[in-house]
Amino acid sequence: MGNSGSKQHTKHNSKKDDHDGDRKKTLDLPPLTKSDTTHSLKSSRSLRSLRSKRSEASLASNVQAQTQPLSRRSSTLGNGNRNHRRSNNAPITPPNNHYLTSHPSSSRRLSSSSRRSSMGNNNNSELPPSMIQMEPKSPILKNSTSMHSTSSFNSYENALTDDDDDRGDDGGESPSMAKVTRINTSSSADRGSKRTPLRRHNSLQPEKGVTGFSSTSSKLRRRSDNTLPASYPLNAEAGGNGSDYFSNRSNSHASSRKSSFGSTGNTAYSTPLHSPALRKMSSRDNDDSGDNVNGRGTSPIPNLNIDKPSPSASSASKREYLSAYPTLAHRDSSSSLSPRGKGQRSSSSSSSSQRIYVSPPSPTGDFVHGSCADGDNGSRTNTMVEMKRKKPVRPVDIDEIIQRLLDAGYAAKRTKNVCLKNSEIIQICHKARELFLAQPALLELSPSVKIVGDVHGQYADLLRLFTKCGFPPMANYLFLGDYVDRGKQSLETILLLLCYKIKYPENFFLLRGNHECANVTRVYGFYDECKRRCNIKIWKTFVDTFNTLPLAAIVTGKIFCVHGGLSPVLNSMDEIRHVSRPTDVPDFGLINDLLWSDPTDSSNEWEDNERGVSFCYNKVAINKFLNKFGFDLVCRAHMVVEDGYEFFNDRSLVTVFSAPNYCGEFDNWGAVMTVSEGLLCSFELLDPLDSTALKQVMKKGRQERKLANR
């Protein structure tokens, strides 16, 4: 499946042989899921797109195929190029049968109309995929009980954003992305099959010719962030001797945990609750927003009930507290989340017709109306009068927000302003924070699930991905991070993902990537986009939300999913489970490694990363990790790969990258890895499209939505 042999393929495999082989072995092809004709029309870079055009003219030519199991002993798949992968369809069955159960597909590929009909009821048969409403699937989150401590709900402010002036005076231009030399890309006429089942063999002995991520293993392999931004703080060890850095790191797990924001908040990445900086930030945010929501929506202090003030507390102290922390004055209760009297549930068992409302974080109760608990009219302050005069903010309807975001995406126009109000964005972020904190830092999921790699603000490609793989809740999703930066529509991208998280909290999951932190977003585009299209407070609100994201996930106890990779200080999964959130990304330690580390074919088990952050780990480290924790596969993102996915170390690790034509510079494909209930791993691909082709695809989707609205 990897590209290790793509350059070693002999010359006797000519293009003529490829085309003849396609015609002769049509019925033996593995299922090629990259056949969504509505989204492959404009690809002129491969013959596979031409076949997609023919298949659109005659859907009867769609073929039936079996999924072929892969084995770590399959030297043909490990060493052959794409044409080998397409023609090799002999199943190889490793001994671990309970993990390798799969059944060949016996049904022909459905047309677009019948596919839509199967996704919903009769009323949805003519709707485009983005508008189909259906019952959510059963929850796949096993450890749904909250695993974090109560102290995680303490008010938290990010010290890295506290000193930012909301007027944006200190925000400079994002530096251009470093140019990267592409590795001798040859124009292959046909890429071959991109959907193959994953079968992990117990043997850890790699086959001859499997070179993993070596310089000859892929036509294009590049880390999505080759260098660390200059503003990213690093310890002295990062730039010093590698052995000294490792010795410092290997025995510093306790300090790593301390850097990950303990409940006391006395770290370099947090501001204490009663700090003057917090008061200053709160008052400054009230003046610059321009919307109806004050503050940043940090989680309220436990046992604080503003609706029922304590008789012993003086009205003056209450008013002083509210003036300093306006966003802490209200917390949604389970019995009053909707103006219609409906309780908002964080469960996927709710029907699709149930409207989900997110209550605003503005203060409510007697204080909003300016009346004090002691009834003293003369004790009203100017702050209370201002709060009384402000127009109340209505709860947002998540379904309506999702449709507005989809309409904006299919409009294919990058506007200066976002389609949502600032107050709506803040409410969405606040609700998402609550959901992230209510779920563990280490998710344990059941199949089936679709695993998505880096998206990087490529909003149109995200809509193409959902169209191909199914809009929620048609499929369960696990995203591996890096939702913002680089792309031109990071705001729409992260907002749509957060809305789906709110709508389907136990079927839609988001992990944290290395770009979901304050320092990186300041350099690579998201800060500038928020400053240009909203304001700096919106960026701060998103950073606070990023600080609550989970760090890793385990699928059915066999597949370890993370954004970056492994860590030399990870000795137990409980160390990830017990990470206290919210937390920024520390300069070193467990969290830093999970988000920044990379695989390497070096002989050293652990060595310094050329990014300047974290480590690189080789095959030995991967095998030790798998054997220690009983996993069969590590699924990660964090690197650009030409085919959208790439295996390493005899299929014990796979990199998934889901942003096709990354930054408009790399002619790479995007991939989504699907894990079936039988632990069969397959890949669905998105072909790289230029801006003109993307606009035509979005135009077609826009026309379908208009017809459905009529």
From Swiss-Prot:
Modified residues (Phosphoserine): 55, 71, 203, 224, 275, 310
Tagged with keyword Hydrolase: yes
Gene3D superfamilies for the chain: 3.60.21.10
GO cellular component assignments: cytoplasm; nucleus
SUPFAM superfamilies, alphabetized: Metallo-dependent phosphatases
Keyword field: Hydrolase, Lipoprotein, Manganese, Metal-binding, Myristate, Phosphoprotein, Protein phosphatase
Residue ranges with Acidic residues bias: 160-172
Biased composition (Low complexity): 40-49, 105-125, 143-155, 247-260
Binding site for Mn(2+) 2: 482, 514, 563, 638
Further facts: Present with 189 molecules/cell in log phase SD medium.
Protein name (database record): Serine/threonine-protein phosphatase PP-Z2
Gene expressing this chain: PPZ2
